[in-house]
Amino acid sequence: MTTILPNLPTGQKVGIAFSGGLDTSAALLWMRQKGAVPYAYTANLGQPDEPDYDEIPRRAMQYGAEAARLVDCRAQLVAEGIAALQAGAFHISTAGLTYFNTTPIGRAVTGTMLVAAMKEDGVNIWGDGSTFKGNDIERFYRYGLLTNPDLKIYKPWLDQTFIDELGGRAEMSEYMRQAGFDYKMSAEKAYSTDSNMLGATHEAKDLELLNSGIRIVQPIMGVAFWQDSVQIKAEEVTVRFEEGQPVALNGVEYADPVELLLEANRIGGRHGLGMSDQIENRIIEAKSRGIYEAPGLALLFIAYERLVTGIHNEDTIEQYRENGRKLGRLLYQGRWFDPQAIMLRETAQRWVARAITGEVTLELRRGNDYSLLNTESANLTYAPERLSMEKVENAPFTPADRIGQLTMRNLDIVDTREKLFTYVKTGLLAPSAGSALPQIKDGKK
């Protein structure tokens, strides 16, 4: 079954995910002038660099849209972001700094909610601005077809006629000007930025070079903490969770998770918290590089993980982290609503997150520099008296108990020695006098 249309379907309704930028503006106008009936759909994702959402549909109508809709995706975006946080669905990290999968979460929400809106309007052909080299083309493809099985895909950037006529930004700008729209290209940055209220992604152009780094980036959700001229004061912050849901910051309760995340963004952003530089594997297995911002999610995740480690046992934490890495990869691949992802996500939400009730206090300084100051929860299994170095009444175990426990360890120690001796005999191990391995001469002794 062919779902991708190589040429413009003239005379038919075509929905386009419309950002208001030059690419989608030129594409919409071009589709109308070539005989299609374009419908424009704009997702309000709380992008920190978008000053006026209401203006975007108005521009789409000016460029020839049959209809233009602004779809408020903020509540769903935050709900999915918190679900990812609860499950630890983050598989990309470098030296302890995490990428919070903010773009994949945004695509899951956009890809389903915009296609659902199109379906309501009887629009069954969808186009967007993703290129054939990136992840988004596959994410949108999957989410679109999951939402509307009758969906057809038309992408101007896969249409050779469109490419021949409007192959670059200069050509698009001139095309708009000749059509009577004084569309001026914005000043070219040294990199590309994509954002939603969960986080921002900076990539491409100069950032494709590994000798260009974070110092060329102008943060849109925080501050350039690496610049000595930027003044940042240390700040104490408290974060409270109830049954896995963040509910309060600095003692102020938020009934609306969207408002809570916005405040978390403001707090974390004042310090540049949550910025990271990652080399990652795209869905097609080629490596790319991105610099990411996620101040609010980073703040919430620090507090959440602190409570996780204080409440759950070691095996639960290990399973949560293993499943989280698997789920993070599925999310990255555009499989957030696949059965295997739902299974992992709901397991974490039920058996890990529901126990996470408590409050964490931390001090934020510059960038990702912070200290944990206090952790409080009625569900803590951390009990310092169990291991206190001081004499305590009614100690949970005695020296005699520990002797018994150590004696039982002899069983596996003997087995381990025999295995090591077997490896020596087969030549797998040949410890020398300077080796840190035990000097095994007889597996029975």
From Swiss-Prot:
Pathway field: Amino-acid biosynthesis; L-arginine biosynthesis; L-arginine from L-ornithine and carbamoyl phosphate: step 2/3
GO cellular component: cytoplasm
Record EC number: 6.3.4.5
Subcellular location(s) of the protein: Cytoplasm
Residues bound to L-aspartate: T131, N135, D136
Alphabetized InterPro entries for the sequence: Arg_succ_synth_type2_subfam (IPR023437), Arginosuc_syn_C (IPR048268), Arginosuc_syn_N (IPR048267), Arginosuc_synth (IPR001518), Arginosuc_synth_CS (IPR018223), Arginosuc_synth_type_1_subfam (IPR023434), AS_cat/multimer_dom_body (IPR024074), AS_multimer_C_tail (IPR024073)
Pfam families with a match to the protein in the record: Arginosuc_syn_C, Arginosuc_synth
Stretch forming the signal peptide: none
Reaction(s) catalysed (UniProt annotation): L-citrulline + L-aspartate + ATP = 2-(N(omega)-L-arginino)succinate + AMP + diphosphate + H(+)
Main location: cytoplasm
Subunit and interaction comment: Homotetramer.
Protein name, as recorded: Argininosuccinate synthase
Originating organism: Bordetella parapertussis (strain 12822 / ATCC BAA-587 / NCTC 13253)
Gene that encodes it: argG
